[in-house]
Amino acid sequence: MIYGIGIDLIEIERIKNLQNQTKFIERILTIEERDKLNQYTHEQRRLEFLAGRFTVKEAFSKALGTGLGKSVSFQDINCYNDALGKPCIDYPGFYTHVSITHTENYAMSQVILEKNE
């Protein structure tokens, strides 16, 4: 049974302007996600990855119905890729369906949550 659907869109330029602010990356990305980010050497690909992770966490919190804040933080949401490259989020009590896309200027994510009964 579908519990919630969330979607988020961001201009990559906004992430470009934020990425150098003190602790922005540490606040947004988990340790595993930072390790993945550091594997990318091309600046545009790094920005796409960071923007994608930002939007997927926003979309997840919207699907959960809480938004980011007291109930769930950026650090509570770890997005990783499975063996086939599909983005995944593990969260107790839910099955998640994740989609991340980007163009040169925008990143967008959609998350569908199903209650794990």
From Swiss-Prot:
One of its GO terms (biological process) is fatty acid biosynthetic process. Mg(2+) binds at D8, E58. The keyword Lipid metabolism applies. SUPFAM superfamilies: 4'-phosphopantetheinyl transferase. GO terms for molecular function: holo-[acyl-carrier-protein] synthase activity; magnesium ion binding. Its cofactor is Mg(2+). It is an enzyme of class 2 (transferase). One of its GO terms (cellular component) is cytosol. Its EC number is 2.7.8.7. Pfam families: ACPS. The keyword Lipid biosynthesis applies. Keywords: Cytoplasm, Fatty acid biosynthesis, Fatty acid metabolism, Lipid biosynthesis, Lipid metabolism, Magnesium, Metal-binding, Transferase. It catalyses: apo-[ACP] + CoA = holo-[ACP] + adenosine 3',5'-bisphosphate + H(+). InterPro entries: 4-PPantetheinyl_Trfase_dom, 4-PPantetheinyl_Trfase_dom_sf, ACPS, P-Pant_transferase_sf, Ppantetheine-prot_Trfase_dom. Its main location: cytoplasm. It is found in: Cytoplasm. Belongs to the P-Pant transferase superfamily. AcpS family. NCBIfam families: acpS, pantethn_trn. Transfers the 4'-phosphopantetheine moiety from coenzyme A to a Ser of acyl-carrier-protein. This is Holo-[acyl-carrier-protein] synthase.
